[in-house]
């Protein structure tokens, strides 16, 4: 959604079809596909912001993108890579097969996950060399392969906070969240409107809030 709200094209790879469908139903993703060629064709034909949730494993998909010479402008990863056992599905396994292996041989499962993470990170590094802007999103993907697979070069691409948020902190700007304990969506609109009045000069913030009100 953040990509499409900035008029970008997004290919989001997810191993669980239910999660993609849920995002489509709630408006966070435009369409689901289980075929890479179809997904790329949809993005190629899209006008304006558009997102495709591709059913697949990123450790398979990203090396294939690199092999085809497809270089995304931006790459990040939001798997729960900090949790080897339950946060990452190894390549070559369906969800059901992964569940069975996790139960029957957890050590093998962890090793399969780490092997997939190595492929995943190497593809990120390869695409970075070809021009993609890459960043980690604080999920420890880089740390897992650096610690368990002797891959220190994983840290050749930065974390999101040091690269992008910390400079904003230096300007006195940063993430700010609030909640309406009333449960009334109108109260969120009221706080949005108050913020727009408070900082009338911030065009980017105004654009973002108006788009969020339409989409979320």
Task: Describe each PLM feature range.
Residues 6-9, 47-49, 70-72, 129-132:
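Short coil/turn connectors at secondary-structure junctions
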């Amino acid at each position: 959604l953040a990509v499409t709200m900035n008029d970008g094209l997004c290919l989001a790879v997810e191993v669980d079809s239910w999660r993609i469908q849920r995002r489509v139903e709630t408006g966070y993703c435009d369409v689901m596909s289980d075929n890479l060629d179809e997904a790329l064709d949809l993005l190629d034909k899209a006008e304006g912001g558009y997102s495709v949730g591709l059913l697949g494993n990123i450790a398979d998909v990203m090396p294939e993108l690199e092999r085809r010479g497809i270089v995304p402008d931006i790459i990040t990863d939001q798997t729960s890579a900090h949790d080897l056992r339950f946060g990452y599905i190894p390549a070559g396994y369906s969800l059901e097969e992964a569940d069975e292996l996790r139960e029957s041989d957890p050590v093998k499962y962890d090793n399969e996950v780490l092997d997939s993470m190595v492929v995943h990170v190497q593809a990120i590094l390869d695409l970075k060399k070809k021009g993609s802007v890459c960043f980690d999103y604080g999920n420890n993907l880089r740390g897992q392969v650096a610690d368990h697979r002797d891959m220190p070069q994983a840290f050749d691409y930065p974390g999101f906070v040091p690269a992008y948020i910390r400079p904003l902190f230096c300007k006195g700007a940063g993430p700010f969240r609030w909640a309406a304990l009333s449960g009334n969506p109108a109260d969120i609109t009221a706080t949005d409107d108050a913020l727009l009045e408070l900082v009338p000069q911030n065009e980017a913030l105004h654009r973002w809030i108006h788009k969020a009100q339409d989409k979320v």
